Amino acid sequence: MSTNLHWQSFGQGPDLVLLHGWGMNGAVWQQTVESLQPYFRVHVVDLPGYGHSAESHAEDLAKIADLVLQDAPEKAVWLGWSLGGLVATHIALNAPQRVSKLITVASSPKFAAERPWRGIQPNVLTAFTDQLLEDFSVTIERFMALQAMGSPSARKDVKQLKQAVLSRPQPNPDSLLVGLNILADVDLRDALTSLSMPMLRLYGRLDGLVPIKVASDLNEQLPSTQQFVFNQSSHAPFMTEHEAFCLQVREFAA
């Protein structure tokens, strides 16, 4: 089992690390990298069990974070999308000396709904887990459709996500299961108040996985953080409203 993850670095400038979400790989960032590399040294990793890191495996969030930190820049702005946002947040909480600023995209400190907290219904996550054990390619396809649902460019977004996934080795089913367990079980809400670095939270108004109510709930809990909502986006604002997304990142990370 390999402990080395697949990294790619582009451009020159301050270090910026991009972390992808569940079922995906670093290829989802291709367009983002092209737009940001004139301003940053952009580092893209395939998380353990995904893409070119499919031979690696980590059994929980802490182990994923440890493997990612092994070859990451000494200090960087960290940006995590969806599940990647949990990984980036975990790193910011447990290795704050490595994180100058934190950006989360369509992410939540707790993905599973638990009244009054909004999120993914636990039975949806359970259904994904059951489906995963039967046919993981169908599961990923359903998840992609769910991510784009509501976005005016849903069909285009799904196509882009699909192309990214298919351009690299398929994810390791064990790692997919670990990821679903993290989405179902992890709760970083209380820990967030101890974050020491500047934080920007980016959301899609039409997101069906991270309801927009999460943004306002966290505004109350984290008044010193910044947030921005993309009005036309669902779960992948970096695709749906690409230019506006890159502008938010540039202004905050500079």
UniProtKB/Swiss-Prot annotation:
Pfam families, per database record: Abhydrolase_1
Protein name, entry field: Pimeloyl-[acyl-carrier protein] methyl ester esterase
Binding sites annotated in the UniProt record for substrate: W22, S82, L83, F143, M144, A145, L146, Q147, H235
Keywords: Biotin biosynthesis, Cytoplasm, Hydrolase, Serine esterase
Catalytic activity: 6-carboxyhexanoyl-[ACP] methyl ester + H2O = 6-carboxyhexanoyl-[ACP] + methanol + H(+)
Family: Belongs to the AB hydrolase superfamily. Carboxylesterase BioH family.
Assigned GO CC terms: cytoplasm; membrane
Location(s) in or outside the cell: Cytoplasm
EC number(s) on file: 3.1.1.85
Domain AB hydrolase-1 stretches: 16-241
Function: The physiological role of BioH is to remove the methyl group introduced by BioC when the pimeloyl moiety is complete. It allows to synthesize pimeloyl-ACP via the fatty acid synthetic pathway through the hydrolysis of the ester bonds of pimeloyl-ACP esters.
A GO biological-process term: biotin biosynthetic process
Active site positions: S82 (nucleophile), D207, H235
InterPro entries, per database record: AB_hydrolase_1, AB_hydrolase_fold, AB_hydrolase_sf, BioH
Keyword Manganese among record annotations: no
A GO molecular-function descriptor: pimelyl-[acyl-carrier protein] methyl ester esterase activity
NCBIfam families reported for this sequence: bioH
